[in-house]
Amino acid sequence: MVHRNCRAILFYFITFLIAAFYSILPTLAEAPKNYLKGKFYISVKDHFLVATEKMTDNRFKKTVIVMLDNDEEGAWGLVINKPIGKVPLRFLINTLQDQKNEKKELYSVEIPIFWGGPVDEKQIYILHSKEYKNDTTKNYKGISITRDYKILFDIAENKGPQRYLIILGYSGWADGQLEGEMEVDHWILSELDSQIIFEEESKNKWPKAYENSFIRL
């Protein structure tokens, strides 16, 4: 009788494990754009994508990228440690489709800009701290992005966000492309840190982000 009860308990336990396994299959199937590390799926969104020493593309050597999305169409983000220099506000306003012929007295104010990646390098992204917002602001983990001329005027008048980067262009990957680059160790992931984004000197961002990396695929 004791052996029979033990077999019954074992049978029900195994049945429970099988049912539990199949119950999580839909969850695994819904995460094709996440990256398997051990037993956990990690999304690149809201992380730093950090170039390793194995990076072969000279444009991305020692880059740190804030990853803003990854889905079935691919992934994209903004490089944060490649300064271009300072340009007059006029240059930035002229690149915007919704530019307004106003506040021309501010056009000569020089503003530092960064290279965000090789895709659509005339597009402007203002990556900034979260206390500032307007109708075009999108919020992410610990940071925000605004993409209109109003924030540029606010920055020129010292009325903008406390911390910001003005970035031209972005970095993008087609479906499956980033996975392939990570599989050959061109990239690792690191926790997104707003202090590294806004407060570290550009030359220190890559060493800091690389030091904090936690996923090597």
Regions found by a protein language model. Give the residues of each.
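Bacterial N-terminal signal peptides
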Residues: 12-23
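A short aromatic-anchored loop/beta-hairpin motif
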Residues: 28-167, 171-217
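Bacterial N-terminal signal peptides that target proteins for export
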Residues: 2-13
